[in-house]
Amino acid sequence: MKKNLIVGQSGGPTAVINGSLYGVVTEAMRHTEEIDEIYGMINGIEGFLNGHMMDMRSLIETNELSLLRTTPGSYLGSCRYKLPEDLNDPVYPLLFNKFTSHGIGYFFYIGGNDSMDTVSKLSRYAKKINSDIRFIGVPKTIDNDLVHTDHTPGFGSAAKYVASMVREVAIDASVYDNKKSVTTVEIMGRHAGWLTAASALARKYDGDNPRLIYLPETAFDQEAFLKKVQEMLETTPNLVVCISEGIHDKNGTFVCELAGDIGTDTFGHKMLTGSGKYLENLVKERIGVKVRSIELNVCQRCSSEYLSATDLNESENAGIVGVQAALKGETGKMITFIRNCDLPYELSYETADVNEICNMEKAVPSDWITEDGCDVTEAFIQYARPLIQGKVVLPEENGLPLFAYRK
């Protein structure tokens, strides 16, 4: 008996999250004997609760489906809705009644840690009530902090953007040789510094910028930082320093908190910003050289110009494999990437229990960080470099990229 499929996106978008959506939709269209309607949740599980859905097959009638693959952001819209911990909460029967009324047999959620938490809760509730709906998580996060997977879709393109921007910033900073300067680049990363570590890929030779890289995996020492900056300025007069937004001192206080109060989001996460500005002012006051801070901000996750072909292909494949896994009877699983080889780079796809993934964070390994805590080792470079390979040619019109727009 045919069943309907529904797919949604949640959390912060990436440049390739729609690649996974494209993979889910196109693979589902190939299985006409098992899958009938293909629905998209508008604004994730929260939108679905409010009855907001769309027919994904309608994209065939326009050029939207072909544009979807290379469109950044979340085509279906996102949410940060957290399902209750208590599986006896009335929201669960409400959701499953809606699933039943729409004939849903396959549920796909494309997202990061909190999204996998949603898949976990829904699959556990399904087991509790003996529902045969299959729940699959398709990973995405530029933070690259999901466990049980070599890396996550979205990280490769964001890493390519970060490394490209840092290389360009370093060139710009070096145009004047008669005045010392320090440029601080603040990069996304709350508790895991994978994206900031990727700034090391910008270097063309030993001793090239960025000379200093600080991750949240190690405690940030303000005085040691100032000493390092002074030392580096002797050999690198136009110094570039890359920091994660979540760097903190030995007591766990975020550097950005030293600059003032910060708010929290709906999941209780502190909204981190301002670490670069704080260090800019610190260097200006204590060392007295020309300073500038740059916050890469949302461009890290929405730049289509720096798409990694490797990342986009893997993102699409994650969606494809997700559909195949559900049709084989798997549920409560997340698609994972298994690296078979670095040179040449080889990858395979598997599934892992989402309950062992959600609410866990994968940090940059300590042996990939230098002993002084202000750089990464060659092991990280070997890990990250394959993920940024390949350029994606975007469809264009009048000199600008063409994207899919949900109306």
Model-derived features: positions:
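Accessory alpha-helical/coil subdomains and C-terminal extensions
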Residues: K98, Y106-G111, D117-N130, I136, ...
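Glycine-rich oxoanion-binding loops at beta->alpha junctions
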Residues: G51-G105, D114, I142, P153, ...
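Short glycine/serine/threonine-rich phosphate/pyrophosphate-binding segments
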Residues: T14-V24, F48-L49, P84, Y92-P93, ...
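Short, ordered loop/turn segments at secondary-structure junctions
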Residues: S10-G12, M41-E46, R80-Y81, G112-N113, ...
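N-terminal phosphate-binding or glycine-rich loops at protein starts, especially the Walker A/P-loop
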Residues: M1-M53
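C-terminal non-catalytic interaction/assembly regions of soluble proteins
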Residues: C256-K407
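Gly-rich Lys/Arg/Thr-decorated short loops/hinges at beta-loop-alpha junctions or inter-strand turns
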Residues: N4-G8, L68-Y81, K140-D150, K179-S181, ...
